[in-house]
Regions:
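Divalent metal-binding segments
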Residues: 2-6, 11, 15-26, 30-276, ...
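Flexible, glycine/threonine-enriched loop-and-boundary segments that flank and lead into catalytic domains
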Residues: 278-283
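Accessory "access/gating" subregions that flank catalytic or transport cores
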Residues: 286-289
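A conserved non-catalytic segment of reverse transcriptases
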Residues: 302
Length: 351
């Protein structure tokens, strides 16, 4: 069955036909865009209905954000923002903070607004504007109030001693190579996973996470996006994320679709051989619904975040001489890639 949608005007964003007045659809797929009379060859051969709900309105294409991370957004959007850039959000505007003194002043003000023992989560820190961060610096500002400062890249986080005690960081568990500097309260790249596993009771608390997903829906809708991509489903907790996304991003009040791409190394953590990854990824297809869809895609990670200056660079490298960090060494990454490649998966790699 065809449906012919009439509109006052359709902005196609196609130079060959910038404007039209009708769009013909079959089973959710656009068959043709143009003027109704041009669609007669289709209409003569198939049953169709005319839908005039947009007859007095202008239709324009929705945008696609292929790399959004809705779970990450749901975690950070409820946080307090201290960033070097202005953020215009549906619920308010955040003014930029571009120096270290301003960052500390804002952090102190936010700390004063929190109740005794109530943790403070801050997102948006970046060393190029806000200077070096450390446990000692945070404690100078917020004292023994549990405080978590998340880097702009999201690939690293800093905590004071109170926050580390709150989430149960055990110094004796920290081994060389874990990408954790316990003295600085710094958890980066692979070490971020250690921190997240202990932060999950706070950042994935049902009410908190649901509020974050509601904010995500507002942001996506206000930006005119009709499709987004989650390029690392499971980065926090695969089961919890999948269930929450199904609850909050599937329904008539959701104005967009989400393509889900699983975090490949999460599927095979705990000693599961990479060769079993495709089988585990295939099982996720059973979760597909109208707005949430896993495909034969997988996300893998190579090196650190560019925003954090932890990406691996070839010569001449970083000006100060430091080196980036591996999330997966080339040898390990190759094992995962080959497993999914031979299983026919499209592979997305963070580099």
């Amino acid at each position: 069955m065809l449906t012919l949608y009439n509109a006052r005007s359709i902005i196609t964003m196609n130079e060959s036909l910038p404007r039209a007045s009708a769009v013909l659809v079959r089973d959710g797929m656009i068959i043709e865009v143009g003027e109704p009379e041009r669609m007669e060859p289709w209409l003569r051969h198939e049953e169709y209905v005319v839908d005039d709900r947009f007859a007095e309105q202008v239709i324009c294409p929705g945008f696609i954000d292929p790399h959004l991370h809705p779970s990450m957004a749901a975690v950070l959007l409820p946080m307090e923002f201290i960033t070097a850039m202005r953020w215009k959000l549906p619920w308010g505007e955040v003014q930029p903070v571009t120096d270290s003194d301003g960052f500390d002043e804002r952090m102190a003000a936010l700390s004063d607004m929190k109740g005794v023992g109530e943790p403070l989560f801050i997102w948006g820190y970046h060393q190029l504007w806000h200077g070096p961060m450390s446990r000692a610096r945070i404690e100078t500002v917020t004292g023994d109030k549990p405080t978590v400062v998340w880097h702009r890249s999201f690939h690293e986080v800093y905590m004071n001693a109170a926050a580390m005690d709150m989430i149960g960081v055990v110094a004796a568990e920290i081994k060389p190579g874990m990408q954790i500097d316990i003295e600085r309260g710094w958890f980066f790249e692979g070490g971020l996973g250690y921190a997240i596993s202990r932060l999950n009771p706070w950042i994935l608390a049902p009410e908190q996470y649901a509020a974050g997903l509601q904010r995500l829906k507002q942001v996506v809708h206000s930006g005119g996006h009709t499709t987004i991509g989650d390029l690392a489903t499971g980065m926090f907790n695969l089961t919890a994320e999948a269930e929450a996304l199904s609850q909050h991003l599937e329904g008539d009040d959701v104005s967009f679709r989400t393509r889900l791409v699983a975090h490949g190394t999460v599927l095979t953590k705990g000693g599961v051989p990479p060769q079993q990854g495709p089988e585990l990824a295939e099982a996720l297809l059973q979760r597909n619904s109208h707005r949430l869809h896993f495909g034969r895609h997988i996300k893998l990670f190579s090196d650190g975040a560019f925003f954090s200056q932890l990406a691996q660079l070839q010569a001449p490298g970083y000006i100060d001489g430091h080196h980036g960090e591996w999330l997966s060494t080339p040898e390990v990454l190759e094992q995962h890639i080959r497993s999914y490649w031979y299983a026919g998966y499209q592979i997305h790699v963070h580099v």
